[in-house]
Every structure is written in C-alpha cells, then in structure tokens.
Amino acid sequence: ADITKLRKMTGAGMMDCKNALTESEGDFDKAVEIIRKKGQAVAAKRSDRETSEGCVLAKSTGDYAAMIALKCETDFVAKNADFVALTQAILDAAIANKCQTIDEIKALPMGSGTIADAIVERSGITGEKTELDGFNFVSGPCTAVYNHMNKNQLCTIVAFNKVCDEKIAHEICMQIAAMNPIAIDEAGVPEAVKQEEINVAIEKTKAEQVQKAVEAALKKAGINPAHVDSEEHMESNMAKGWITAEDVVKAKEIKTTVAAEKAANLPQAMIENIAKGRLGKFLKEVCLLNQESIMDPKKTVAEVLKAADAELTVADFKRFTLRAE
C-alpha cells in the first residue's frame, strides 16, 4: 500500500519506491525525501546536457492563454505518458493562476513540494535533464490556441481585440504555426531589423547590377559568362576546348575593370528603390496581417479578419517550437 501511495505522490517507478521505503526502514516521509534527493542528484549530474526534445502544450481559458514546454534529452522520454501528464499539470496550474513569468510557475505548489521540485523529481525518474522553457502567455477579450497536429512539438497562442468566431480564431492560430510571422504588422517589426534588411537588399542589388554589367561585357566580347564564372570552370572549359587561354585572360580583365567601373557609377536612387521594394516583400512575409492567408491565398490575413468583422484584429500572439526552422 505504501509503495502505491509513494508512486502516486512522486511518480517514481515501483522499484525506486520499494528501494526508498527499504532504505528509510518504512518511514514514508523519509522515503519521499530519498526519492527527491535522487532526483536532485541526477539533475545536478546532467545539468550541462542539451535538452532538444520535450513536450509543448497550450491552453486557453477565454481571456487568457498560455503555452509551456517541458524539455528533456530524448524523444523516448518526451513521449512518455507521465511526462506529457506532468507538462499538462504544469500548464493547468499556470492557467489557473494566470501566471506571467516562468519563475511564478516554478514556485506554484505541486504534490508535496513545488513545480520546480516536481521537475527535479521527474529528472531523477527518467535519468535525463529536465527543464521548463517556452512559457508565453497572451490576454485579451478572446484568446485561442493551436497544438500542431497534437504532436506536442509546436504551439501557437493568439489574443484578439474582441470576441470572434471560433473558426476564424483557429485559422489565425494555424496561420501563425505555418508561416511563422515575427510581428502583427509593420509597426511591430523592430527598426534594427528593417534597417538590416534594407542594408542586405542594397548590397544584393548592387552586386546584381555589377554582375549584369560584367555579363553584358563578356557577351559583347564573344565569351559565354557561364564558361568563366569561376577558376574551376575556366580550367575545365579550357581543357574541353570551349575557351582559349586568351579568352580567360580577356575575361579576367573584363571582370575586374567592368566590375570596378560599374560599382563606382551605380545609380543610387534606383538601388534604393529596388531595396525598398525588397523590404516591402520581406514585411509582407513576416507581418501576420500582411501575409497571404493559408486558407484563402487570394486574401491577406487582414482581409480575412475584416470580412469576418470590420473591427476585428489580432492584439497579440506567441509561437514556440522545439524544432529548428
């Protein structure tokens, strides 16, 4: 009976509970402490290990939604029913208390200790480093969540400015999961990100303009640009008889002189206009409201929301995944 009670309280395996009760000479409280210390020892020993697997869950209670990730080392542990149940219990506690930080969650009571203790105990049971991560929350008049394919790997949570149709809310959650926007609209994209995109676009446009000029000059000289686009190609194409050594010398001279001349005389206004166009394309891809709807590609997300309710918009969203993208 004590073994069953100890298993229920700690989640430890039958043999661990039996050994703890034997070691404590039947003292139940001491047995609980033994299991807890074992968990702490395992956790400390594996503190430098990488936790690339885990379980991610999200839940909404009307005006508040949250997500949490309980991370571990292997897929085998992540899929274990007890591990998933612990993740769900932690999320339920966070939801019930409308937590705003991960430290708040760790301090909440669970079992005979706190959630932080429960995580350490789970580490002792599985023998793997276990940690809490990925906590995010949103709040508003209406919230929705999406657990991607119920595989506990990717979740999204969304808050709307007013109560909205459940189907629309679900579609927006799926949109965020699929298209991974970084902001609701352009105003939410940091200026540093925009400037970096402009800088990259300018350099890319300059390089393209220089390349066009070089290719035009090579063609005018009777040389196929594809035959001289690298040292390796020049050597192999000479061996094949497609170009001569004189062609190579001429091509190298053209590439050097034309590239330098074009780079020194690039039309700045044109370059900036092209770069701005590329920034616009980037913002369309990364801003949620600007994106094409995955459910109706002829419309943007903003248009889908407006069609449902002229005043409806997204107030906040969060996305978390265990997988590299």
Residue ranges and their predicted role:
Residues 1-325:
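N-terminal assembly/interaction segments in proteins that build large macromolecular machines
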